[in-house]
């Protein structure tokens, strides 16, 4: 397989790297680009890794993941969503992106179709191209109010569709599917004999008070055709650990384990034991963190909407603010370049999340209130 030209540089990393170089050169830059939680990894995770290393748990482990962690994940989702998974239906991976990539690599064949609902996480098209370069990608855009056009999705999916790739809670838009939308996506997939749903739910815990995340795990009729991917980067700030997982039927999990065996061998053994500690402790940091995010998001929303160029809606989850820039008369890359050059604020162009969204940009508000106020002060001067 040649390295396909369809693999593109992620614009959030591009702008973040540019900002890092400018900071090294002594320039005062405020980066609201990368989605990284501004909290510390729980001490019990670090202690669990250290303990595992002292006990000699530093060697090869099962390519599917250590049994204790797989069993704990299965029990956790069963308790939350009322589903019925076992450890044999769980696959541990070095991050959510690899978890998705493993599934795509094991499912896709040349000329298969994948339908992506946009705005989408920026790595999806490249992940698909790497897994199977001859895949036909179809994009179904959300409506302007971020609701799903069920009729358009139904029209896009056919018997050639191998996967419908979805992300709710959504990065970059901070929106979530309704119960009806989740059920409708399942019904559409089940109309066709070989169509899977790959659901990225890594922001499932970062939901604001009064809002409800509807997981595909709750839809029991889709279980055999569902790949649910998740991880610990957002819920436990473990971005640098690279640790994620997927839930799928046993047959597919076995294929993914074989794929991992012949590529990565296994996900880091001591890190898996650190993650195991997550399921032995209460997740009592989540509620106050979400309250803090909502407070910061409300501040940012109220302030940035005073600017004539920017109009956004208050998100329901996560730490991204999705803002319309049509009033500026410019496209997303141009606006992001000018924000950086003129006032030293870094954002991510909307076009990287789907072609329809070139009149949007994304800000990450996973920074302190002081940093956000500094950013707003600068953005107020931007013209």
Task: Put a short name on every predicted segment.
Residues 11-19:
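A short, well-ordered alpha-helical element
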């Amino acid at each position: 397989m040649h390295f396909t030209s369809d693999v593109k540089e992620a614009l959030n990393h591009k702008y973040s790297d540019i900002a890092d170089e400018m900071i090294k050169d002594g320039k005062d830059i405020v980066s609201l680009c990368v989605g990284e939680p501004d909290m510390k990894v729980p001490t019990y995770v670090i202690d669990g890794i250290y303990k595992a290393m002292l006990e000699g748990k530093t060697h090869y482990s099962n390519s599917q993941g250590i049994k204790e962690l797989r069993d704990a994940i299965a029990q956790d989702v069963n308790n939350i969503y009322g589903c019925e998974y076992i450890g044999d239906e769980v696959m541990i991976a070095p991050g959510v992106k690899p978890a998705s990539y493993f599934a795509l690599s094991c499912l896709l064949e040349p000329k298969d179709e994948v339908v992506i609902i946009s705005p989408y996480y920026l790595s999806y098209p490249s992940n698909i191209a790497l897994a199977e370069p001859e895949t036909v990608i179809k994009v179904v855009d959300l409506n302007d109010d971020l609701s799903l056009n069920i009729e358009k999705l139904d029209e896009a999916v056919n018997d050639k569709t191998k996967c419908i790739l979805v992300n709710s809670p959504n990065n970059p838009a901070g929106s979530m599917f309704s119960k009806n939308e989740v059920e409708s996506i399942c019904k559409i997939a089940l109309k066709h004999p070989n169509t899977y749903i790959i659901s990225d739910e890594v922001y499932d815990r970062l939901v604001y008070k009064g809002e409800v995340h509807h997981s595909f795990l709750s839809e029991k009729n889709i279980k055999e055709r569902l790949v649910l991917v998740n991880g610990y980067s957002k819920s436990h700030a473990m971005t640098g650990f690279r640790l994620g997982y997927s839930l799928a039927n046993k047959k597919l999990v076995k294929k993914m384990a074989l794929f991992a065996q012949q590529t990565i061998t296994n996900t880091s053994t001591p890190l898996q034991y650190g993650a195991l500690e997550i399921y032995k402790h209460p997740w009592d940091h989540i509620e106050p963190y979400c309250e803090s995010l909502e407070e910061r998001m409300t501040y940012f929303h109220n302030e940035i909407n005073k600017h004539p160029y920017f109009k956004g809606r208050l998100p329901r989850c996560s730490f991204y603010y999705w803002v319309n820039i049509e009033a500026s008369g410019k496209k997303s890359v141009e606006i992001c370049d000018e924000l950086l050059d003129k006032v030293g604020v870094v954002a991510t162009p909307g076009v990287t999340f789907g072609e329809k969204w070139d009149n949007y940009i994304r800000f990450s508000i996973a920074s302190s209130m002081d940093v956000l106020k500094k950013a707003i002060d600068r953005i107020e001067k931007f013209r």
